[in-house]
């Protein structure tokens, strides 16, 4: 316990001294050191799945009908481009109709010890073979077949270029139920929350996935063969959604990616909202 306290004190001193970017990196590295003991890299036998009938999942804690307009438009875009699939938009009250989660997770999020975003991270790991799309994702085309055909696919980051500690984001996930990476992440999260009732870092999922990605030949092989989804391009629209709308810039981004990560923390321009439904 004294060793942990000393480590925390050292981190607090470093956080006070360094700028915002360095503070973010320090927090991420300390979180990874703490999470390391929970990593679980067991690999299960691979089973075949029917990619043509993959369900699509999303989540809004208070229910789809209570989501803000931006989120409603995002859901509409998913229906427009992936309406041939079974689309399930869950809420806290409907989860039990679709999947069985350990009661501990419900208790943690209800008590406020687990943020809703991290509860959502847990949920997506229990949905077996699926495509997960965060509620803040807008589609402007169908999901490419090469992604549907993959056993595991997430949005990628360039840690050096993006000045970040992780090489993935979890707002879009394509995963088979027996994906080595999916199961390793799931078991690691289970190991962590079985012993802890606090959030070590908001980006726990990304930290864990990055740490696991090359831990075994099986994990690395699956990671290396996944289609490349460029996080910088997928997130570009978020940076301009509240500015003067440019149809030319919007069309250019749509030509580069089928999905766009937005945020409900910004007020989108009226022109932007109008074009979301086009």
Which positions does each model-derived feature cover?
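Glycosyltransferase-associated regions of secretory-pathway enzymes
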Residues: 1-120, 137-278
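Solvent-exposed aromatic/hydrophobic patches embedded in short alpha-helical segments
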Residues: 119-130
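Short beta-strand-to-loop acidic/aromatic patch adjacent to the donor-nucleotide binding site
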Residues: 128-138
């Amino acid at each position: 316990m004294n060793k942990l306290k000393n480590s925390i004190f050292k981190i607090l001193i470093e956080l006070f001294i360094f700028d915002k970017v360095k503070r973010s990196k320090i927090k991420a590295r300390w979180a990874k050191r703490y999470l390391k003991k929970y990593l679980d890299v067991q690999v299960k036998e691979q089973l075949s799945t029917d990619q043509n009938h993959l369900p699509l999942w999303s989540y809004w804690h208070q229910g789809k009908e209570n989501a803000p307009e931006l989120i409603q438009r995002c859901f509409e875009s998913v229906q427009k481009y992936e309406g041939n699939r079974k689309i399930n938009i869950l809420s806290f009250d409907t989860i039990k109709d679709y999947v069985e989660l350990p009661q501990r997770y419900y208790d943690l999020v209800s008590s406020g010890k687990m943020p809703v975003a991290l509860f959502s991270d847990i949920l997506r790991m229990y949905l077996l073979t699926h495509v997960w799309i965060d509620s803040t994702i807008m589609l402007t085309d169908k999901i490419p077949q090469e992604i549907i055909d993959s056993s595991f696919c997430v949005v990628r980051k360039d840690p050096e270029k993006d000045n970040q500690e992780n090489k993935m984001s979890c707002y879009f996930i394509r995963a088979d139920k027996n994906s080595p990476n999916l199961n390793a992440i799931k078991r690691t999260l289970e190991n962590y929350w079985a012993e802890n009732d606090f959030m070590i870092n908001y980006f726990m999922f990304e930290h864990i996935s990055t740490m696991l990605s090359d831990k075994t030949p099986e994990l690395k092989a699956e990671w290396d063969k996944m289609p490349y989804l460029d996080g910088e391009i997928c997130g570009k629209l978020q940076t301009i959604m509240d500015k003067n709308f440019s149809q030319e810039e919007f069309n250019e981004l749509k030509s580069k990616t089928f999905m766009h990560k937005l945020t409900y923390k910004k007020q989108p321009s009226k022109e932007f909202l109008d074009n979301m439904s086009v």
